[in-house]
């Protein structure tokens, strides 16, 4: 009589199937969460680029104004130098933001498993 053995095998197969379903569902949820987090990071990085671009433009305008003030003698070299330093920092922050944006796009591409950016037509 193999009734109990057969019943145990059936139950074991059912449990294994259910476990596989749960593992698959857990993996789907993990992947979905990873993709959502990567997408939110891209959105945040894009907003950072916009903010840093505006800051860079303001610093550029401030340097232009300070240069003109220095030219007509109503500003000191120290003030001009400070405006140039602020402009350089704003340029650097903008470049860092651009780099961060591309990093976040690469992370999103890795999460979804496909390339999201188009090729530029170059040799790369």
Would you name each region that the model predicts?
Residues 5, 43, 118-124:
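Amphipathic alpha-helical coiled-coil scaffold segments and their short linker/junction regions
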Residues 54-114:
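Short segments within alpha-helical structural elements
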Residues 1-61, 96-99:
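Sec/SRP-type N-terminal targeting helices
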Residues 47-50, 107-108, 114-116, 120:
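Short leucine-rich amphipathic alpha-helices used at interfaces
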Residues 7, 77, 117:
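Short, electropositive, low-hydrophobicity segments enriched in small/polar residues
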